[in-house]
Curated annotation (Swiss-Prot):
Name this protein carries in UniProt: Transcription antitermination protein NusB
Transmembrane region(s): none
InterPro entries: NusB-like_sf, NusB_fam, NusB_RsmB_TIM44
Keywords: RNA-binding, Transcription, Transcription antitermination, Transcription regulation
Family (UniProt): Belongs to the NusB family.
Function: Involved in transcription antitermination. Required for transcription of ribosomal RNA (rRNA) genes. Binds specifically to the boxA antiterminator sequence of the ribosomal RNA (rrn) operons.
Length: 143
């Protein structure tokens, strides 16, 4: 398994923990990392993802909700939602990561940690976001 996959899985676990506690998100992340320190070779990408999602969660959640036809975020499984948050963060803030890679990683990790339906659910929402962002970028280039 690649380093980035392992960093994404650790970011998922940390965000799951952050969601389950009443502590401020960055404090909860620090506590998670005290108990489960990320390996040095994963730390940079892990922290970029985990802190990036936490610091941009409102924007990311709005984007997910816009593309999750008739699904409210609170009804989604924590695994599926946090995987989509990680992928959406990569879409918006990690131009070096191809969006298809982010989608495939979220699907594969969702199949491992989520339910039997996680892969298809994650794929549907992330693909919609990917298409939407692609259209916005094309429109920007035409200007």
């Amino acid at each position: 398994m690649g380093k980035r996959r392992r960093a994404r899985e650790l970011a998922l676990q940390s965000l799951f923990y952050v969601d389950s506690t009443s502590a401020p998100p960055l404090e909860a992340l620090d506590l998670f990392c005290q108990n489960f320190p990320p390996p040095k070779d994963l730390a940079q990408f892990f922290y970029e993802l985990a802190k990036g999602v936490i610091n941009n969660q409102d924007e990311i959640d709005r984007l997910i909700e816009q593309h999750s036809n008739n699904w409210k975020l609170y009804r989604m499984s924590a695994v599926d939602l946090n995987l989509m948050r990680i992928a959406a963060y990569e879409f918006l803030f990690c131009p070096d990561v191809p969006r298809r890679v982010s989608i495939n990683e979220a699907i594969d990790i969702g199949k491992r940690f989520g339910t039997a339906e996680s892969g298809a659910f994650i794929n549907g929402i992330l693909d919609s976001i990917h298409l939407h962002l692609g259209k916005e970028e094309k429109a920007e280039k035409k200007r």
